[in-house]
């Protein structure tokens, strides 16, 4: 793959090394001063009287047009003002971006105008006699609990997988068979980097498989130190590269952990701080990758990070057409279909992938990769109606909204770093 374009200064000329270093230091310092938890706490405090034991976006009495709704709108405007004041210091903070999107959703939901009165600041000082305990602030390293407390609902999740020769199921339910060799990024966002390396199953063979997977969990404030996990065929470790099995010594270090369901063939990595679970398997001398990730995390990337197989599927030039997939291989197609049908009765994309892999490789054990990929999808998908895919030859195009995400993310990051 080619290198990403070099960053440019606002005036168009390449910035010097010292300028880049200064900008990185400033942005890093700003990141460490993010006050989003204070904004969250003030919002929860200001809505306590509006709730009857429900979530912050469920006002008590009066409906959307009642007095409680008016109080909620004032609280939301205060919340939005607080996030704007701390925006420059919250670059790359998942809690901040989640709060901004949540405020927008709630203001639309409750028909709140952007202009208007705000809630009074929360009272300071000792608790009054007889008052109950202060509301608990959600653990910043428990993504699902924090999201549910903020939005009053469970977060959305996306699923991606790569297995076999290799086949990719993208976040948007595209299903491609790829001709890729070498290292390709499955994910590359602000929190997570995943790279898969494919090579021929043997010298001169037409079939390629994933032989190596590298995962980088990027440093995240009080939650985890940066951790690297690397798996290769016949070497599926039960620890990160530094020998640890969690996110380090930070307060939220336990929010990243490795578990082994079957040593040497099945590893599960849970990253609760970003609402993510990853399964890596080894079957028939190949690796497979499967992930369930929070939507906010999957979409947190810039224009320079747009080449991600989990986001856009295989590049068009690297996709195998239907005619290429149906060419005769080492095993006859009818024989491969019979072998795959035993474990995959539905003739969906997983079944077709199995037929291709068994036919091209000549190895009946390739049926296991497709079967376990389907099993993982059954676990990870929130909507099982999307379990079985029957894709067209090219796969559905990305919607304009999805294509705009990298551009908008890049503009937002630039604004945070350079606005004054």
Curated annotation (Swiss-Prot):
A lipid is attached at residue 393 (GPI-anchor amidated aspartate). It is a lipid-anchor; GPI-anchor. Autocatalytically cleaved at low pH; the two chains remain linked via two disulfide bonds. Also proteolytically processed by TMPRSS6, several fragments being released in the extracellular space; regulates HJV activity in BMP signaling and thefore iron homeostasis. Keywords: Autocatalytic cleavage, Cell membrane, Disulfide bond, Glycoprotein, GPI-anchor, Lipoprotein, Membrane, Phosphoprotein, Signal. GO terms for cellular component: BMP receptor complex; cell surface; extracellular space; HFE-transferrin receptor complex; plasma membrane; side of membrane. The keyword Cell membrane applies. Glycans are attached at residues 111, 206, 365. Residues 125-134 have a biased composition (Low complexity). It is found in: Cell membrane. Coiled coil: none annotated. Residues 394-420 form a propeptide. GO terms for biological process: activin receptor signaling pathway; BMP signaling pathway; intracellular iron ion homeostasis; multicellular organismal-level iron ion homeostasis; negative regulation of BMP signaling pathway; negative regulation of transcription by RNA polymerase II; positive regulation of transcription by RNA polymerase II; protein autoprocessing. Residues 113-135 are annotated as: Disordered. Residues 1-32 form the signal peptide. Pfam families: RGM_C, RGM_N. The modification Phosphotyrosine is found at residue 43. Muscle cell lineage. GO terms for molecular function: BMP binding; BMP receptor activity; coreceptor activity; transferrin receptor binding. Disulfide bonds join 141-223, 160-310. The record marks 165-166 as: Cleavage. Interacts with BMP2 and BMP4. Interacts with BMP6. Interacts with BMPR1B. Interacts with TMPRSS6. Acts as a bone morphogenetic protein (BMP) coreceptor. Through enhancement of BMP signaling regulates hepcidin (HAMP) expression and regulates iron homeostasis. Belongs to the repulsive guidance molecule (RGM) family. This is Hemojuvelin. It comes from Mus musculus (Mouse).
């Amino acid at each position: 793959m080619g290198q990403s374009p070099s960053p440019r200064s606002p005036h168009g000329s390449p910035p010097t090394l010292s300028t880049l270093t200064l900008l990185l230091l400033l942005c890093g310092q700003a990141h460490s001063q993010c006050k989003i938890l204070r904004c969250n706490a003030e919002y929860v405090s200001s809505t306590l009287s509006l709730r009857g034991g429900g979530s912050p976006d469920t006002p008590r009495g009066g409906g959307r047009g009642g007095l409680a709704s008016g109080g909620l709108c004032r609280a939301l405007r205060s919340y939005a003002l607080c996030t704007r004041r701390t925006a420059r210091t919250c670059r790359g903070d998942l809690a901040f971006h989640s709060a901004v999107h949540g405020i927008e959703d709630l203001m639309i939901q409750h028909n709140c105008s952007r202009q208007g009165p705000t809630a009074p600041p929360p009272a300071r000082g000792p608790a009054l006699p007889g008052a109950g305990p202060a509301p608990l602030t959600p653990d910043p390293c428990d993504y699902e609990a924090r999201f549910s407390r903020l939005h009053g609902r469970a977060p959305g999740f996306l699923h991606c997988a790569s297995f076999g020769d290799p086949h990719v199921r993208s976040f948007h339910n595209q299903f491609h068979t790829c001709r890729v060799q070498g290292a390709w990024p499955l994910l590359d966002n602000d929190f997570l980097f995943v790279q898969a390396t494919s090579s021929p199953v043997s010298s001169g063979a037409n079939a390629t498989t994933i032989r190596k997977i590298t995962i980088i969990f990027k440093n995240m404030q009080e939650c985890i130190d940066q951790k690297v996990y690397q798996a290769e065929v016949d070497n599926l470790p039960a620890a990160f590269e530094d020998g640890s099995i969690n996110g380090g010594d930070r307060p939220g270090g336990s929010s990243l952990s490795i578990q082994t369901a079957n040593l040497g063939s099945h590893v599960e990595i849970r990253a609760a701080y970003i609402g993510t679970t990853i399964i890596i398997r080894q079957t028939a001398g190949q690796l497979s990758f499967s992930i369930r990730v929070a939507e906010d995390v999957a979409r947190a990337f810039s224009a320079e990070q747009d080449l991600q197989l989990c986001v856009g599927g295989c590049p068009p030039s690297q996709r195998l057409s239907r005619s290429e997939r149906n060419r005769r291989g080492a095993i006859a197609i009818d024989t491969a279909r019979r072998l795959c049908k035993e474990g995959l009765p539905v003739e969906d994309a997983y079944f077709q992938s199995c037929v291709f892999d068994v036919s091209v490789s000549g190895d009946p054990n390739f049926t296991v990769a497709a079967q376990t990929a389907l099993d993982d999808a059954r676990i990870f998908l929130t909507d099982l109606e999307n379990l079985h895919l029957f894709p067209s030859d090219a796969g559905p195009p990305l919607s304009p909204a999805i294509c705009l995400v990298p551009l908008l993310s890049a503009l937002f990051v630039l604004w945070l770093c350079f606005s004054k």
